[in-house]
């Protein structure tokens, strides 16, 4: 445990340097493997090393397993909680030797259904059904959680799940120098106040929250979360029954260790507090995050600064994250469910006052449209919605869809402290609540759980996503679920998707690009 600010900064810098070296080494190994021996060499790498940025051999030349034509991959319903299978299982699966997905590793019992897209009939197979175009295939996979198909890799988009083969993601394996792979990792609410911070201090280990997830998270090219907690050496720590969240700079060590690059502070605990920490508390937090090498966005000392996105570049692909506070700075829906009406004292930044980037739709949409013209990937990360419910409010749906109409690549949301589902709108995903990642709400199953979102891009195109369910142990330590626990979470996630469709004006035509 560091005893002085200088020791603290030295330790954080050591963590940051070590992480950067690990990422650099991984990318170099992947590049060498792809150039030297193609996909076979990639398959020989450790799993965490096969996770970016891919082989330069091109989609048409990739041969993943016996039974798969060159340039093709297996895709399933996104509802199937199965990331991949072994190469030796591919041909038997296509030929109907497996009747149930649990036979190839799925954590549940679900009949296998082969759907064939016209022109792509695997040799020696007997499909359950045939569809005429890709849109019909997407519909078939959405309607049947056990359905799968063989597809050319270049046809695949984020509306289907692409199976890894022997730990190799076909989308990444087929990436090229002109269309490189980029993996983004998105976490939900991270809060080190109250019991979470107390547990760190009890153990005397400020990296402990991330020990069970750090290796996987550090494998991503970019990792971002919502961070809502004051970080200060001058503010007194709040008691466990307090709704003000305060921690010390040492608490950031775990985020650095796990590879967090940036965090949105556009939320209801960046400026507002019952004790009145206000702008000085926000400044402390921003300072300590920046010192740790984690860039805060969605806040600033005036409105212009609060509207500035966090921008990064990976393999030549530019990415902009844009934070918006729809809870304590909601100027367009001040009286709606899930909004703290701040009256004459909002947290919103203005031309002359610091604060969070407010939810003011004409301003937000103009910003998104401008960012779309400048960057390849644009991801608004909202803090909004009613807490502890399964489905989004209608105003949240309206806000999210307008952002997609403005050109956003996807929409991310935190704040409800319970997982909600997602929807595909105009071919792009909206994630209505990613849920808790580090928070001391042990009182319900929903608040103890969340997910880590994996997004795989090829160039600027989102080709796939996966949700990795997490549960929170002992008030402060996330771990990834597995087996039946993961299957149960997956079931609740998709039930929320279906309930949202029934209650929020869903139509299948709205899903089309």
What are these regions (language model features)?
Residues 1-28, 35-42, 47-50:
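N-terminal secretory signal peptides
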Residues 62-177:
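Flexible loop/hinge segments at secondary-structure junctions
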Residues 23, 44-69:
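C-terminal segment of N-terminal export signals and the immediately downstream linker at the start
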């Amino acid at each position: 445990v560091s005893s002085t600010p200088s020791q603290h900064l030295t330790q954080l810098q050591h963590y940051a340097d070590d992480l950067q070296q690990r990422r650099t080494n991984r990318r170099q190994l992947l590049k060498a493997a792809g150039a030297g021996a193609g996909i076979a060499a990639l398959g020989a790498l450790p799993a965490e090393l096969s996770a970016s940025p891919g082989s330069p051999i091109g989609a048409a030349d990739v041969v993943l397993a016996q039974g798969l034509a060159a340039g093709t991959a297996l895709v399933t319903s996104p509802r199937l909680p199965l990331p991949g299978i072994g190469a030796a299982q591919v041909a038997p699966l296509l030929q109907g030797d497996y009747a149930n997905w649990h036979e190839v590793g799925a954590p549940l019992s679900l009949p296998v259904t082969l759907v064939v897209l016209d022109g792509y009939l695997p040799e020696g197979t007997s499909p359950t059904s045939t569809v005429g175009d890709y849109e019909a295939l997407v519909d078939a996979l959405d309607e049947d959680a056990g359905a799968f198909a063989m597809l050319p890799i270049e046809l695949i988009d984020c509306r289907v799940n692409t199976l890894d083969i022997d730990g190799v993601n076909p989308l990444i394996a087929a990436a090229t120098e002109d269309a490189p792979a980029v993996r983004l990792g998105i976490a939900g609410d991270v809060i080190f106040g109250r019991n979470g911070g107390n547990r760190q201090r009890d153990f005397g280990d400020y990296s402990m929250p991330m020990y069970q997830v750090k290796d996987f998270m550090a494998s991503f090219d970019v990792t971002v979360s919502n961070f809502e907690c004051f970080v200060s050496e001058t503010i007194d720590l709040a008691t466990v029954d307090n709704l003000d969240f305060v921690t010390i700079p040492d608490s950031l060590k775990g985020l650095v260790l796990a590879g967090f690059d940036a965090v949105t502070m556009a939320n209801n605990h960046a400026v507002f507090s019952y004790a009145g920490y206000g702008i000085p508390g926000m400044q402390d937090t921003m300072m300590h995050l920046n010192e740790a090498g984690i860039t805060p966005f969605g806040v600033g000392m005036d409105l212009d600064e609060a509207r500035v996105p966090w921008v990064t570049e990976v393999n030549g692909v530019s990415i902009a994250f844009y934070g918006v506070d729809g809870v304590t700075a909601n100027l367009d829906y001040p009286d709606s469910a899930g909004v703290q009406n701040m009256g004459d004292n909002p947290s919103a930044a203005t031309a002359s006052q610091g604060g969070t980037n407010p939810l003011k739709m004409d301003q937000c949409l103009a910003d998104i449209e401008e960012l779309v013209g400048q960057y390849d990937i644009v991801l608004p990360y909202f803090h909004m919605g009613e807490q502890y419910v399964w489905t989004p409010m209608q105003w949240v749906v309206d806000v999210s869809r307008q952002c997609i109409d403005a050109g956003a690549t996807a929409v991310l949301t935190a704040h409800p402290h319970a997982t909600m589902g997602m929807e595909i709108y105009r071919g792009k995903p909206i994630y209505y609540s990613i849920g808790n990642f580090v928070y001391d709400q042990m009182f319900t199953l929903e608040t103890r759980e969340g997910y880590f979102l994996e997004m795989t891009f090829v160039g600027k195109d989102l080709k796939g996503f996966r949700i990795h369910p997490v549960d929170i142990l002992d008030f402060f330590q996330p771990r990834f679920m597995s087996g039946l626990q993961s299957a149960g979470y997956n079931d609740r996630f998709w039930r929320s998707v279906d309930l949202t469709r029934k209650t929020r004006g869903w139509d299948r035509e709205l899903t089309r690009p």
